[in-house]
Amino acid sequence: MSFLNIFTFFSVLVSVATAVRFDLTNVTCNNLHGPHCGTYVMEVVGQNGTFLGQSTFAGADVLTESAGDAWARYLGQETRFLPKLTTIASNDTKNFSPLIFTTNIYTCNPQSIGDAMVPFANTVTGEIEYNSWADTADNASFITGLANQLFNSTQYGVQVASCYPNFASVILSTPTVNIFAANETLPDYCTAIQLKAVCPPDAGFA
């Protein structure tokens, strides 16, 4: 059995076992501009220098193809070439880049300046995802006002947590970011977190 098949099997198995319930609703746009500006990064409260971002890794298919084919896929900006895991880490973590957001005053949706990916919640795992191709999946739920709910999670019926719920997060030694109902007991592999808006220059970003 190939590594990819084993990975898929464990991912499906654990995803079914860790299904969570949450009720995300649209909220009024409020206080989304951060302390000083409309462009911001999300810092984990109480963990200085730890931000919400993406960790990239090379998939099994990339490692088995020729250098020429891999280079062509990279130049073509194929979204599946380097899968991204939404996680929290410090800015100097290898293969990690913080997500930089800007406020949309009309819809309250955060958008990454670098890749313009739209966030959504996976209704099976509860994981917050930004993968540009995965929004077509049956279990994708677009969330209007997601940033506001992350900043004020207890007010809007959700908890935000960093989790090690599946095979991928264990292998990559980096947690996923998940959302749960406010009254739900978190699994023992999850830790509740809070996020705050920080202006990029204040966080050490140019």
UniProtKB/Swiss-Prot annotation:
InterPro entries: Vel1-like. The keyword Signal applies. GO terms for cellular component: cytosol. Residues 1-19 form the signal peptide. N-glycosylated. Keywords: Cytoplasm, Glycoprotein, Signal, Zinc. Transmembrane segments: none annotated. The keyword Chloroplast does not apply. Glycans are attached at residues 26, 48, 91, 139, 152, 183. Induction: By zinc depletion. It is found in: Cytoplasm, Cytosol. Belongs to the VEL1 family. This is VEL1-related protein YOR387C. It comes from Saccharomyces cerevisiae (strain ATCC 204508 / S288c) (Baker's yeast). The lineage of its organism: Eukaryota, Fungi, Dikarya, Ascomycota, Saccharomycotina.
